[in-house]
């Protein structure tokens, strides 16, 4: 061997290794899945390169994965004829945490980067140390000599040019020196089970070096000759008996051979009716590395002008980073005529369906397709359209089973709502899949379709209210009149509802109307209309006084027909943001604050003329327009209405002081001085009054 070079692991790798050795995975068996997966990636890469340059396969024309357990030396060896690694790859990728995965490789290749190994091993490689105390990696890349990497995970590793070992031709050989307590991974049965469990659907042959014992019948004198030599003496026996024994003599012969473990042809090439639920589950797990089974599967083929086969899975739970845009989703693998081309192919499926996993195998795409040409590819656009259509069908199939759909909806309702926001073609379909709690649904959730069937006679609109939580909206003042009249109101309490409902606008010809915005019109009898007019007249004076006190805090103050019990509420404009949307936008750290100016619409204060507080306030205001307590009460009512209507307070301290003053009044505590009122502006301000009158005229 030539000179040995020693390199220190990067600090994070050391941490990672101690993490892996101590806590990383409890089920150590996954190391084999990870290493086979790495081999499969390396084979994908060389196959991809060979599509444009056949000579790349000269070093080793066969593509395979070999596994050799050696009980004599307690080693497990994994050999693949993949792309291999150069010396630089070895140092970089097995010394620092590398970016694993075909995606970066494809992108770099498309960008004209050097096609030598780019990040073959991710964290998966280090999982070898779950079972091994020492790992030796021998590797040969087309562009470099053969090198050996070795480490006992003690903070450093060595790299040496391999002059003594066998020539690999091309590829990588990993020898794992197993720990004393991990020798089960040398057992043929255990290894076969593991490969079947995790790597059954790897598209390259995985062969295991197995012992085979065969019984041979020996009828000649060979056996006897051997015995004679060994014992040095011959027993005299009956001739006949000897002949008889010679005929029957059986001897066990032990030999080794390769045994192919993954005999299945790709699952998507088989007929759906032939495939069992267990086979789909095994395929899903090998595809996604999920430890749970899938929730639903759709296996179909499209024929005609365009041919492709696909298997799509919906997982049981959403990944914790579902909406993490920085992380590349590993969702749909793209094959062309059984040749793996790339994973996480963004162009195959819209972002809002990124939770759907699966594979697509096209007969029509060119084999040398790159990410750049993908975007312009017409075939891919048709495939994408078909996939979305099939996903929608799959969701409707899940919806037939209530229990399954509840699981699905809990995990992926945000995606459906995002679909409504982004996909105008399928908007109506997605709307059918929505489920909401409502004033009449109890603990169950209701669909828009069911809501429509329960609509009252003469009801033309679907009513909804948005808010922070079900608890927050259940007793909202906005619902009082609607409940009294027996209308059902949907609770939309997911932040994304604000966006999706902004796009949906209607369902089956019925307009979606917010209970918290202007323009809520409820059917009224002639008597009710007449009564309303009288009350408007009666309270006109109070409305003006309140507008003067509140100034530009509100656009106008009017007599309400939507509140029944509460004294008042604050309503937003029909096309502006609701209180809930305002809250959501304020919570966004990187928001564009210029937009808030014109989208957070002016509030209208609606007062309830039948509420005793309002009636008393009217009497006081009529008696003395400048009554100090009227002003205090109006401001207090406004601030309380802000809270009950879902807005946030601009000045919580002032509100607190007002409440404290009311408490003192209630407890008959005298104010010691007028200091407490000093911060309250005077009620009568001639300029403000004039301004207020102008506003009235505008209104």
UniProtKB/Swiss-Prot annotation:
Residues 219-228, 672-690 have a biased composition (Acidic residues). It is found in: Cytoplasm. GO terms for biological process: cellular response to heat; protein folding; protein stabilization. Most abundantly expressed in roots and apical shoots. Low expression in mature leaves. PROSITE patterns: HSP90 (PS00298). One of its GO terms (molecular function) is ATP binding. Disulfide bonds: none annotated. HAMAP family: HSP90. Induction: Heat treatment increases expression 3-fold in mature leaves. Has little effect on developing shoot apices. Homodimer. Molecular chaperone that promotes the maturation, structural maintenance and proper regulation of specific target proteins involved for instance in cell cycle control and signal transduction. Undergoes a functional cycle that is linked to its ATPase activity. This cycle probably induces conformational changes in the client proteins, thereby causing their activation. Interacts dynamically with various co-chaperones that modulate its substrate recognition, ATPase cycle and chaperone function. It comes from the Eukaryota. The keyword Chaperone applies. Residues 219-248, 672-699 are annotated as: Disordered. SMART domains: HATPase_c (SM00387). ATP binds at residues 38, 80, 125, 371. It comes from Solanum lycopersicum (Tomato). This is Heat shock cognate protein 80. Belongs to the heat shock protein 90 family. The TPR repeat-binding motif mediates interaction with TPR repeat-containing proteins. The lineage of its organism: Eukaryota, Viridiplantae, Streptophyta, Embryophyta, Tracheophyta. The keyword Cytoplasm applies. GO terms for cellular component: cytosol; perinuclear region of cytoplasm; plasma membrane; protein-containing complex. A motif (TPR repeat-binding) lies at residues 695-699. Keywords: ATP-binding, Chaperone, Cytoplasm, Nucleotide-binding, Stress response. CDD domains: HATPase_Hsp90-like.
